[in-house]
Regions:
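A domain-start/cap signature at the N-terminus of enzymes
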Residues: 1-32, 44-45, 50, 55-58, ...
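Structural cue for short, hydrophobic secondary-structure segments
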Residues: 35-38, 65
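Serine-hydrolase catalytic-loop signature spanning alpha/beta hydrolases and amidase-signature enzymes
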Residues: 40-42
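A fold-wide structural signal in alpha/beta-hydrolase
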Residues: 60-67
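Cap/lid segment of the alpha/beta-hydrolase catalytic domain
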Residues: 67-102
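A short beta-to-alpha transition loop/helix N-cap that caps and shapes the active-site region
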Residues: 71-75, 158-164
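Alpha/beta-hydrolase active-site loop
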Residues: 89-119, 139
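Catalytic His-Asp charge-relay segment
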Residues: 169-172
Length: 172
């Protein structure tokens, strides 16, 4: 069923939702899929609309739906408060005083936290992202390739200036 968790990363409370299938057995390691929402979304909304909690239920997968940070950004000369993943340096023009959050650190912390609560299959940790979440997933394919087996991105991309030097080569 649905679980809401929070963790503290660099002094900020960060939120994520986890669907634990009814068939979960703590004696059997369970595969993990991160689902990263797009711009203006959040973990709860993606939990409700992505269809992955249902897939996780039928396929016995622990599905994770983290929420990105709400930033003040300047886009096309307009200031707006909107959720975005900090997918690569220089991706957005932040308002004065806004501090980009370390989302890779956040996603790693989720794995650590959940590893203390559940029996995770460390060889089957995957990440799926849509739009800005897809951009974040591609960043993680480089910076988290030591803990992620594969990444799927939809409607996202690598930054043009991304240095692709992954810790391990994984399918993207």
């Amino acid at each position: 069923g649905k679980n809401r968790f929070t963790t503290v990363v660099d002094g900020d409370d960060r939120e994520y939702y986890v669907h634990v299938p009814e068939s979960y057995d703590p004696d059997v390691p369970i595969p993990v899929v991160f689902m990263l929402h797009g711009t203006s979304g959040d973990g709860l909304k993606f939990y409700n609309i992505s269809g992955w909690k249902e897939l996780g239920e039928t396929e016995n997968i622990l599905t994770i739906f983290p929420s990105s940070w709400r930033y003040c950004i300047i886009e096309d000369g307009n200031t707006q408060n909107i959720t975005k993943w900090n997918c690569f340096p220089g991706a957005f023009s932040f308002c004065s005083g806004e501090t980009p959050r370390d989302d890779v650190k956040f996603l790693r912390q989720i794995l650590t936290d959940l590893g203390e609560k559940f029996t995770l299959d460390d060889a089957r940790v995957y990440m799926v992202g849509f739009s800005n979440g897809g951009q974040m997933a591609t960043r993680c394919s480089v910076e988290m390739s030591d803990v992620i087996a594969a990444v799927v991105e939809s409607a996202g991309s690598f930054s043009n200036d991304t240095l692709v030097n992954p810790l391990n080569k994984i399918p993207v």
